[in-house]
Amino acid sequence: MPTTCLNFTKKCGGCPLLAMPYREQLAQKQARLQELLGGFAPVKAVQGMADPLHYRNKAIASFAAQHGKLVCGLYAEGTHKVLPGADCLLQEDILNKTLAAVLDAARTCRWTAYDEDRGTGLLRHTVLRSSADGKVLVTLVTPGPELPGSKNFCAAMRKKAPWVVSIVQNINPTRTSAVLGNREKTLYGPGFVLDMLCGTQFAISSRSFYQVNRTQTEVLYKKALELAKLTGRETVVDAYCGIGTIGLCAAPQAKQVIGVERNPAAVKDAA
């Protein structure tokens, strides 16, 4: 696999296996599966991707102040040192473009980065979610509800990144490594992005669990449904269902689907 990422040599914590040939990565996964499951049943070959790059539909970046300037990016491995955002080889291209627009707009608003040691500053993280048709949900994580200039930020984003369909402020006052808090305010748009998976449309919000590899998720779900051999008479229980991707994809082939989930935000998205 290519190692042209500018941050790879700086020990970015995002993809430590980038330098390993993809076939070797698959071989290691195969060996691990054989070790874990081989004693119970035959383990078939791992089905890899045709192009294992730019597949992630979710990006999380942290903000920091470096040399008096606001930056954002991933942490260096094993640290909380932010590596300013180079174009990530795993994220969808639209997310790299959106991240650059978020940083530019935040600088225009003269927002400051949150300092986790002092507990001061405004921006902690940004979380981006993208759809198959190139639409993006932007979430800004702040330590408190104050976000002065948020209207100017939204206006700037609509100009710089017109593919952004919604902007949400997530409030996380805890001094922990958790990215998202439990409170949110929608600043622009519906508060979610719509995506298609196996022919079914899903609403994805910032706190919803959603598979980050859309391509391989469809491969996995279609194979699972093929092996399930549903006849239309079954009741399918989708335990820990999140926004219900498995159950809703199975619904056309089953009598009924029951989803079980404790996260209210995920249940709202599934509905």
Feature locations, PLM:
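Rossmann-like S-adenosyl-L-methionine
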Residues: 149-271
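SAM-dependent transferase fold signal centered on methyltransferase-like domains
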Residues: 1-185, 197, 226-233
